[in-house]
Every structure is written in structure tokens, then in C-alpha cells.
């Protein structure tokens, strides 16, 4: 296993394409706000300072808030395997 750390920026009002990761994901919102949209769950507003755990294989497509969002994301990943899978449907780009 390996841990991948990403600095993720979502522009104001932009939606990340629907996708999932085979491993668990830990998100800490550094700046701005976002809405976490996850299949099968109610939309979750997030603000700077909030954290959230996304379970393995959870299809999600976050949306940047009015000022956008910046998050540090820690992803547990099996080394050598694909880390992100796009899912067609609403929010797909």
C-alpha cells in the first residue's frame, strides 16, 4: 500500500466528474467551501477546517462553493493499480 497526498482545487461552482477510488480517502478542507455529493447519501456542505472520510468505492462528485475550495486529500492506494475510476451519469464531464 501507499498513501497519495493531493492538493485539490475546485473552482467556484465547478463540479468534479463522478468518480470513485478503490481505497479510502481522507479529505481536509483548507480554504473556501464545497458540497460533497456522494451516491446514496445526502449532500454534505463542507467549510474550511472540516474533514471527511470517503469510503472505498464510493461514487462522488464534489462541487466548489461560491469562492471555490482547496483541500488536502490523503488516499490509501494499492501501489501499481489505477487510483481513480470515472463513472458516467449526472455530473459526468
Residue ranges and their predicted role:
Residues 18, 26-28, 53-54, 70-75:
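Structural recognition of the beta-strand scaffold that forms the well-ordered cores
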Residues 1, 13-26:
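A short beta-loop-beta micro-motif enriched in histidine and acidic residues
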Residues 18, 36-37, 59-66:
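Short beta-strand His + acidic residue motifs that chelate non-heme Fe in jelly-roll/DSBH
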Amino acid at each position: 500500500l501507499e498513501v497519495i497526498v493531493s492538493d485539490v482545487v475546485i473552482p467556484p461552482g465547478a463540479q468534479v466528474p463522478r468518480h470513485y477510488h478503490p481505497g479510502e480517502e481522507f479529505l481536509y478542507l483548507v480554504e473556501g467551501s464545497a458540497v460533497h455529493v456522494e451516491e446514496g447519501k445526502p449532500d454534505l456542505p463542507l467549510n474550511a477546517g472540516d474533514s471527511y472520510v470517503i469510503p472505498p468505492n464510493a461514487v462522488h462528485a464534489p462541487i466548489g462553493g461560491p469562492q471555490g475550495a482547496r483541500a488536502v486529500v490523503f488516499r490509501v492506494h494499492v501501489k501499481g493499480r489505477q487510483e481513480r475510476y470515472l463513472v458516467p451519469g449526472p455530473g459526468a464531464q
